[in-house]
A protein has these predicted regions:
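Non-ligating segments of multi-cofactor redox enzymes
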Residues: 1-514
Length: 514
């Protein structure tokens, strides 16, 4: 057993209001520079829809993730080593800029400088790539916001598989949900396997997947290899970049920027302990519908004395074990089984999980009360969002885990409503879904009224155990041939030439020292 720790995230889709605050703050901090105008490390999609980039879930088109061979061995869907190297100079499945969108701004200055005329001046769009004026904006990162666009395009959503999707184009059957997305920082990342230069690595101490900018050669195979399409090519620097899970903040015990600024407080951060020796076995599971359960078996119980003893022997710091015991991610994913992984069928074992959303009643005919089939809880099938759609999104098509999560949340609401509105303690609903009163009370606290310290349990890192800091003492940071080493290049991250400081200590005023 090889015990490792990972900082994971859970997003409660039942509380997401689609405000895009997480996207804007992430963009301002990490990708608001030349070459990354089109890149959104965090974006919020409206489902159903084809997403950003277009059809990112269609792995028949983009060849991301892993496939299981006849022998049971995993191979990147993009191909084996020879196959990847054979198309290194011309990748046929690489998303183009039009699959994302052409980034643009507006001629705001024209509003100030326009001469007096008969008509009001307008700020026309201008491309951030070519600098030319754009006649028409054809796509954007949130083009499908609030079900924007025609249903014919949204119907290409891969999560409609095994469903009669035509019926959901009718107004009375329309449904929608928000899906915030970021890098999954997988346990079995396919981007690492497809990088020819070996520039992508997974940090041992916290599981964050990063790209070494010194090793990256811009082959962009990682972009195709990532099934979530969360790696972006910086056309200015010639390097690939991705979400870094705000690791400078994580190392100091602070949450990521997207989590810190989330208006709906839907994000939870915590530590999970897992057995690295079981990753290959879990990812190689024969049936895709079993991948969720196999991944759960990889995680270790942080309260088990045997696990604690072995973790200490293997060098896991004590504060990391304590954080794992208080982790909201472990509670939501393992204790209560409410959180589910995004597209486990990609076999990457993702570590950003989602609590499925409860939705309104499907029709007015049910407004008087949901059908209950003789039980205390109403029939989940009568909710507006189809269970099969959520299952295709979060559990590889298996409706069992989704039904369990939805029923447990409904049972919690039924219990708290009877307690606060009717003044009685009705435990029939929670007993029906296998929960105790103590579990439901704790679920309510975490899902409804959790404090800051409940949602974010992040131990400070021990960088002294991860790497030798001595060789980095004169490090220059993130530069492109300019900066502290005094290069003559004209390139500067802030689009201006580097200006050397002038020593004025020896300059004397006129008349001094005479």
């Amino acid at each position: 057993m090889k015990i490792r720790s990972q900082v994971g995230m859970v997003l409660n889709l039942d509380k997401c209001i689609g405000c895009h605050t997480c996207s804007v703050t992430c963009k301002n901090v990490w990708s608001s520079r030349e070459g990354m105008e089109y890149a959104w490390f965090n974006n919020v999609e409206t489902k159903p829809g084809i997403g950003y980039p277009k059809n990112w879930e269609d792995q028949d088109q983009w060849q991301g993730g892993w496939i299981r061979g006849i022998s049971g061995k995993l191979t990147p869907r993009l191909g084996n080593r020879v196959s990847v190297l054979s198309k290194i100079f011309a990748n046929p499945v690489l998303p183009a800029i039009d699959d994302y969108y052409e980034p643009f701004t507006y001629d705001y200055q024209y509003l100030h400088n326009a001469p007096e005329g008969k008509y009001l001046p307008t700020a026309r769009p201008r491309s951030l790539i070519s600098g030319e004026r754009m006649d028409k904006i054809n796509w954007g990162p949130n083009w499908e916001e609030l079900l924007g666009g025609e249903f014919e395009k949204r119907a290409r959503d891969r999560n409609f598989e095994a469903m009669q999707k035509e019926m959901y184009g009718q107004f009375e059957n329309t449904f929608m949900m928000y899906l915030p997305r970021l890098c999954e920082h997988c346990l079995n990342p396919s981007c690492v396997a497809t990088c020819p230069s070996g520039a992508i690595y997974k940090r041992e101490e916290d599981g964050i997947v990063l790209i070494d900018q010194d090793k990256c050669r811009g082959w962009r195979m990682c972009i195709s290899g990532c099934p979530y399409k969360k790696i972006y090519f910086n056309w200015k620097s010639g390097k690939s970049e991705k979400c870094i899970f705000c690791y400078p903040r994580i190392e100091s015990g602070q949450p990521t920027v997207c989590s810190e600024t989330c208006v709906g407080r839907i994000r939870y951060l915590g530590v999970l302990l897992y057995d690295a020796d079981r990753i290959e076995e879990a990812a190689s599971t024969e049936h895709e519908t079993d991948l969720y359960e196999r991944q759960c078996e990889v995680f270790l119980n942080p309260n088990d004395p045997a696990v604690i003893e072995e973790a200490l022997k293997q060098g896991i710091p004590h504060n990391v074990i304590e954080a794992a015991q208080k982790s909201p991610v472990y509670k939501l994913a393992m204790d209560w089984k409410l959180a589910l992984p995004l597209h486990p069928e990609y076999r990457t074992l993702p570590m950003v999980w989602y609590v499925p959303p409860l939705s309104p009643i499907q029709s007015v005919a049910d407004a008087g009360g949901l059908p209950s089939n003789g039980n205390i809880l109403p029939a989940v099938e009568s909710l507006r969002i189809p269970v099969q759609y959520l299952a295709n999104l979060l559990s590889a098509g298996d409706t069992g885990p989704v039904l369990r999560a939805l029923k447990r949340m409904m049972a919690m609401r039924h219990y708290k409503r009877s307690q606060t509105v009717e003044g009685v303690t009705d435990t029939r609903a929670i007993e029906e879904v296998g929960l105790s009163v103590e579990q439901v009370e704790e679920m309510y606290r975490y899902l409804a009224i959790a404090n800051y310290e409940d949602r974010f349990v992040i131990p400070t890192s021990h960088r002294e155990l991860a790497e030798d800091a001595f060789p980095e003492r004169n490090g220059c940071g993130f530069t492109f041939g300019d900066g502290c080493h005094g290069s003559d290049t004209k390139f500067n991250l802030f689009n201006s030439r580097r200006i050397d400081a002038i020593d004025v200590s020896g300059v004397r005023k006129h008349g001094e020292g005479e």
